[in-house]
Amino acid sequence: MKTIVLAANDDLGLDGEMAQHFGRCPYYVVVRVNGDHQVEQTRIEANPHARQHGPGEVPKFVHSLGADVIVAPGMGQKAIAWFDRLGVEVATGSRGQVGATLQAYLDGAISGATGCKGE
Protein backbone atom coordinates (compact mmCIF):
# COMPACT_ATOMS: atom_id res chain seq x y z
CA MET A 1 0.00 0.00 0.00
CA LYS A 2 1.09 3.54 -0.73
CA THR A 3 -0.43 6.71 0.70
CA ILE A 4 -0.57 9.63 -1.73
CA VAL A 5 -1.60 13.07 -0.49
CA LEU A 6 -2.84 15.65 -3.01
CA ALA A 7 -3.28 19.39 -2.36
CA ALA A 8 -6.90 20.37 -3.08
CA ASN A 9 -8.97 23.55 -3.37
CA ASP A 10 -12.14 21.89 -2.09
CA ASP A 11 -13.51 18.95 -0.14
CA LEU A 12 -14.82 17.00 -3.16
CA GLY A 13 -12.15 14.31 -3.00
CA LEU A 14 -11.12 12.81 -6.34
CA ASP A 15 -13.77 14.95 -8.10
CA GLY A 16 -12.29 18.16 -6.70
CA GLU A 17 -9.74 20.57 -8.12
CA MET A 18 -6.04 20.70 -7.34
CA ALA A 19 -4.82 23.70 -5.35
CA GLN A 20 -2.20 26.04 -6.79
CA HIS A 21 0.15 25.73 -3.81
CA PHE A 22 0.38 22.92 -1.32
CA GLY A 23 1.00 24.93 1.88
CA ARG A 24 -1.98 27.24 1.69
CA CYS A 25 -4.49 24.80 0.20
CA PRO A 26 -7.65 24.38 2.29
CA TYR A 27 -7.73 20.56 1.99
CA TYR A 28 -5.66 17.48 1.33
CA VAL A 29 -7.05 14.39 -0.35
CA VAL A 30 -5.42 11.32 1.20
CA VAL A 31 -5.51 8.27 -1.07
CA ARG A 32 -4.32 4.75 -0.30
CA VAL A 33 -3.53 2.66 -3.37
CA ASN A 34 -2.55 -0.99 -3.56
CA GLY A 35 0.32 -2.52 -5.53
CA ASP A 36 -1.86 -2.61 -8.66
CA HIS A 37 -2.50 1.15 -8.34
CA GLN A 38 -6.14 0.55 -7.39
CA VAL A 39 -7.64 3.07 -4.96
CA GLU A 40 -8.41 1.31 -1.67
CA GLN A 41 -9.38 4.31 0.46
CA THR A 42 -9.91 8.05 0.08
CA ARG A 43 -10.39 10.63 2.80
CA ILE A 44 -10.33 14.41 2.99
CA GLU A 45 -8.37 16.31 5.64
CA ALA A 46 -8.67 20.04 6.31
CA ASN A 47 -5.34 21.88 6.31
CA PRO A 48 -4.98 23.45 9.78
CA HIS A 49 -2.10 25.57 8.45
CA ALA A 50 -3.87 27.00 5.37
CA ARG A 51 -3.95 30.58 6.64
CA GLN A 52 -0.63 30.73 8.43
CA HIS A 53 2.26 28.40 9.09
CA GLY A 54 5.87 28.39 10.11
CA PRO A 55 8.79 26.48 8.60
CA GLY A 56 8.18 22.74 8.50
CA GLU A 57 4.65 22.81 9.94
CA VAL A 58 2.89 21.76 6.73
CA PRO A 59 5.37 19.00 5.81
CA LYS A 60 5.11 17.63 9.37
CA PHE A 61 1.30 17.68 9.14
CA VAL A 62 1.28 15.93 5.74
CA HIS A 63 3.75 13.36 7.10
CA SER A 64 1.40 12.78 10.07
CA LEU A 65 -1.30 11.78 7.56
CA GLY A 66 0.86 8.79 6.65
CA ALA A 67 2.05 10.27 3.36
CA ASP A 68 4.50 8.37 1.21
CA VAL A 69 4.02 10.96 -1.55
CA ILE A 70 2.80 14.58 -1.73
CA VAL A 71 1.47 15.78 -5.10
CA ALA A 72 1.07 19.53 -5.65
CA PRO A 73 1.38 22.05 -8.48
CA GLY A 74 4.21 23.94 -6.79
CA MET A 75 6.34 23.96 -3.68
CA GLY A 76 9.18 26.01 -2.28
CA GLN A 77 12.71 24.63 -1.89
CA LYS A 78 12.53 24.68 1.91
CA ALA A 79 9.38 22.55 1.92
CA ILE A 80 10.94 20.13 -0.56
CA ALA A 81 13.93 19.80 1.79
CA TRP A 82 11.59 19.18 4.76
CA PHE A 83 9.79 16.41 2.89
CA ASP A 84 13.12 14.89 1.91
CA ARG A 85 14.16 14.78 5.59
CA LEU A 86 10.81 13.20 6.48
CA GLY A 87 11.12 10.56 3.75
CA VAL A 88 8.13 11.78 1.73
CA GLU A 89 8.44 11.79 -2.08
CA VAL A 90 7.49 15.11 -3.72
CA ALA A 91 5.84 15.30 -7.14
CA THR A 92 5.13 18.79 -8.51
CA GLY A 93 3.69 20.19 -11.71
CA SER A 94 0.11 18.94 -11.37
CA ARG A 95 -3.01 20.87 -12.39
CA GLY A 96 -6.72 20.26 -12.90
CA GLN A 97 -8.87 17.61 -11.27
CA VAL A 98 -7.57 15.66 -8.26
CA GLY A 99 -8.57 12.27 -9.71
CA ALA A 100 -6.92 12.99 -13.07
CA THR A 101 -3.80 14.21 -11.27
CA LEU A 102 -3.69 11.03 -9.18
CA GLN A 103 -3.93 8.93 -12.33
CA ALA A 104 -1.19 10.98 -14.01
CA TYR A 105 1.06 10.37 -11.01
CA LEU A 106 0.30 6.63 -11.01
CA ASP A 107 1.01 6.52 -14.77
CA GLY A 108 4.39 8.20 -14.22
CA ALA A 109 3.45 11.42 -16.01
CA ILE A 110 4.03 13.50 -12.85
CA SER A 111 7.22 12.94 -10.90
CA GLY A 112 10.04 14.81 -9.24
CA ALA A 113 10.07 18.17 -7.55
CA THR A 114 10.66 21.57 -9.06
CA GLY A 115 10.84 24.40 -6.55
CA CYS A 116 8.92 27.62 -6.95
CA LYS A 117 9.61 31.07 -5.52
CA GLY A 118 7.02 30.51 -2.75
CA GLU A 119 7.83 29.29 0.71
Question: What is the role of each PLM region?
Answer:
Residues 1-53, 57, 65, 85, ...:
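Non-catalytic interface/targeting segments
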Residues 59-91:
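Mid-chain, well-packed structural core segment of small domains
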